[in-house]
Amino acid sequence: HFAVATLPPARSPPSPAMRVLAVLTSGAVLASAIRTRRDDDPCECLNWQQVYKRNGAKCGDGHELSFVLRTGMVDWLARLMYNVEFCYNFFMRIDDNPCVNMVMDNQPGEWYNNQWCYVAKECPTATSLNTSSLLGAKICEPGKDNMLRDKTPFELREMAKEHDLSIGLLMKMAYPVEGEAKWPAVEALFRNDSAIALAAVNASTLARLHYLQSTGAGYVLDSEKGRAPFGVIKGGKTYLIEKDEVNRQE
């Protein structure tokens, strides 16, 4: 259930981010390199499955549901509404220790625009949890921690297959989710770089898209309803995330 489609040559050279359109659902690909720390480092990110099974954490004790709590939803309702999709079908399935997004948004400079993980309470940079005397939550450090944001879409697809995760949700837990340059508004540019396609995109959206492309970082270009299909850009390439027919959590 994986296909890579290379766009046909355009009459004029397309921008680097428009050269490849890959369709990602599930399948086996490259394994990712994982940064390591000493086992006795209290700031080492902990395995997600183990914090729930052995360390007494409950999903929502950390930032698992911050994406919706930030909107003003009360904690008990957030746990009730999102427990299956986000807790059981995502966090509790990850038998690894990657840092994940605090929220599904793109607000550079805001504290919640970072990635996080559970750590031992002794970690000096961790914040304490009201419901656990053993754990803390910390903001991850680029270059030091195993961050989903550093992985390629192909590596994320491998992770989705290995841990039986929704690839759509995994992408949104890895990359900032762009709110202005949304996929329905810009999709035509990646399939057809003609003047007609270009003219269909308003100037501010086009400028925003060009800026995101120039960074080389990964971003989710979300759909209007927040579900697949949507786009991902990273490193000069564009990926189409389609509804996962193998793991129907989209």
Regions found by a protein language model. Give the residues of each.
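Cleavable N-terminal signal peptides of Sec/SRP-targeted secreted and luminal proteins
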Residues: R19-A33
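Bacterial N-terminal signal peptides that target proteins for export
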Residues: S12-V20
